[in-house]
Amino acid sequence: MCIRDRIFVGDDMNWNDCEPYGSNVVKTPYIQKLANEGMSFDNMFTSTAMCAPTRQQLMTGLYPVRSGAYPNHSVVYDSVKSFAHYFGELGYEVALIGKKHYGPADSFPINYLGGVQHDTGIDGDDIDLGKIEPIVSGDKPFFLVIAQNQPHSPWNRGSDQYKAEDLTIPEYMVDSPMTRSHLSSYYSEITYMDSLLGKTLDIINKVEKTDNTISIFTSEQGYAFPYGKWTCYDLGLKTAFIAKWPGRIKPNTRSKATMQYVDIIPTLLDAVGQNPLEFDVGMADTSGNKNFDGKSFFNVIKGETEKHRDYTYGIHTTRGVINGSESYPIRSVRSKKYKYIQNLSHNNLFYNILTAEDKQNPISLLYQSWLKNAVNEEQLNWVKHYKKRPFEELYDLENDPYEKNNLADQADYLEIKKSLEARLHSWMDQQGDLGIESEMKAIYRQDRTGKGEWFSYIQKLKSKI
């Protein structure tokens, strides 16, 4: 049987803002349909809560510092290989439609089917899904990525179906008129994106290739609200991930196994009969290893185990982020129960576009609205913590899932903190991550040559801020 792969990628979407992950507000019937027919993964994580690093770790199976794509709008090192090499050499048609956010071209020899890099909200759909029909109806096996722009801001697909005044504000947000307005528009973007997933599923069904197609939906990193995107908190790093494979994945099932985006390509190679350990990724880690950072969770997909990873890792750099701090490197490690974070330049203030106070860009006024509308001192201090954080943070995720109660200075947790710190530093060493030194070099990893399709957009956006 010829196995085909299709990945549908959202953009800046919280993992829990869709029906399969508990939302009773946001209408996502097609994501739910995919979940009904496949397996939902409850503990999938990216290691960066920014678009370009997230997408490139998915495509390469490498963590960001090792690949070179660790700041936003960045590219991998020239020698790094991607899924396009591995599946192309196996005879696959490797194609992508929609948002790129990868480079250089030699590392991603992909048949690009077109699309825009940011949704303008005009002239109908921003992706012409008709262009995928020749790929999915052909005789060759295919690996197709449908890379969405939604629900990334600007939110311009309307907000009529979610009335701001009727929304219930989650406990990890501050209730303000601007919060309600933004959520209404953000939810509408998700429902619009869901409709495009529905159209994609219809195309696959029409050519009658569903039985031998692995269909995946993933939400990318978290939303562009405080404590989401641009952080190492779970609202930034946790992602929805649903896989359907008729006859191989049991319908309407869930897995609690812990995994990361770097595991996806090794898993899909394993699924088509390849040994992921035999691939040279083009860039060695500090021990000389040229294998993937990720490891296959094919046994989880087959329902043979609920065990995969014990720890996941996170990184954030503000270098090159629009309105970002000059230097605010963040590193994290997460077990099932605890999250440990180091803010390596904690004496600085944390900035990004959410804190910019730019009246021409409504998203940058949201943080100020949270300061003004906090209901009590405890909530106000939590909002202020977004900009001013200590060197260490430690959270009990089972009792504090939204990471509000920092345990790092409590003596009872000293041994737990030390153990997680050792694991974090071991991972950083293996990746060649020098902390602040790597942070300062991050700016040179950005696509400043104009190679990437999104480069001109970023330059225009910067000129307005």
Task: Please provide the spans of the model-predicted regions.
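Short, charged, surface-exposed hinge/linker loops at domain edges
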Residues: 436-451
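C-terminal helical cap and adjacent loop that interface with cofactors, partners, or active-site loops
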Residues: 398
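Beta-rich accessory regions
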Residues: 426-429
